[in-house]
From Swiss-Prot:
Keywords: Cytoplasm, Ribosome biogenesis. The keyword Plastid does not apply. This is Ribosome maturation factor RimP. SUPFAM superfamilies: YhbC-like, C-terminal domain (SSF74942), YhbC-like, N-terminal domain (SSF75420). It is found in: Cytoplasm. Pfam families: DUF150_C (PF17384), RimP_N (PF02576). The gene is rimP. InterPro entries: Ribosome_maturation_RimP, RimP_C, RimP_C_sf, RimP_N, RimP_N_sf. The keyword Cytoplasm applies. Belongs to the RimP family. One of its GO terms (biological process) is ribosomal small subunit assembly. Coiled coil: none annotated.
Amino acid sequence: MSLEKDIESFVKSLDLELYEISVARDGDDSIYRVNVLSTQIEDGKKKGVSLDECVHLSRLISPLLDVTPPMSGEYRLEVGTPGIERKVSTLKQFVLSIGERVALTLKSKEKLKGLLLRVEESNIYLDVDAEEVCVEFAQISKAKTYFEW
């Protein structure tokens, strides 16, 4: 099994979904980031991920990384959420963002903002100004969730 699949199994054991694994640099430090989301609904909204859940997940993942280091050299493990406003770059991330507001930039340079309704195969469906709009995933050059204050 791959390292990502092993991490994903720990994430799922806590009733969370793996959103993204990334490597970042902060000066001389290397950071191995594991971002997770909750798919549970509470009071009609997606439930957040608690700090305790992130700590618990970090403690589950850390021994695995001691045995199978994700990169050479020293690194810091960070477990958290991708935030309210985050990039959306894979079909899985679109699925995990259903019910949230998204801003899309298409390859044609057209920009769309709306509520993400559903994902079917490689089509993304949005509610844009009370009209359902279908966008093919391959036509999206950039996407992110956004929060309306």
